[in-house]
Design a protein with these regions (language model features):
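ABC transporter nucleotide-binding domains
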Residues: 1-135
């Protein structure tokens, strides 16, 4: 199901006011009166060829953000619009069956900092390396 968003400036992904809350179970009946706000009001736009790095402390919601954008977790609210060459889709409004063919267009890469940081390189060298390699 296509959305009414027009593609401009080679935008491939628009995330707007994304929220993902998890209920905290309390009591014998499992009733929930409180929530953990794992992702609360995140917005960003990505253009073709861009990469997004999400950095933060353990438990800050980085993985939850990625999984929610990929629709592995249903968002509590917000929009996730994927722009493909001929159509745009608000992923948060699609069924599992409608999402299935779009999943090949999306990916999340986890990075283990202990295996990716070279102790023989300076921080400047580490940060500059992908920029130099990609022009």
């Amino acid at each position: 199901m296509a959305s009414g968003h027009a593609q401009n400036d080679n935008i491939v992904l628009e995330v707007e006011d994304l929220k993902k809350f998890f209920p905290i179970r309390k009591g014998r009946l499992g009733r929930s009166s409180a929530v953990v706000r794992a992702v609360d009001g995140v917005s960003f736009t990505m253009k073709e060829g861009e990469f997004l790095g999400v950095v933060g402390e353990s438990g800050s919601g980085k993985t939850t953000l990625g999984l929610t954008v990929l629709m592995a977790h249903a968002p509590t609210s917000g929009s996730i619009v994927l722009h493909l060459p001929n159509e745009s889709y608000d992923l948060a409004k699609l069924s599992s069956a409608e999402l299935r063919p779009l999943r090949k267009e999306m990916q999340m890469i986890f990075q283990d900092p202990f295996s990716s940081l070279n102790p023989r390189m300076t921080i400047l060298d580490i940060v500059a390396e992908p920029l130099v390699l990609n022009g």
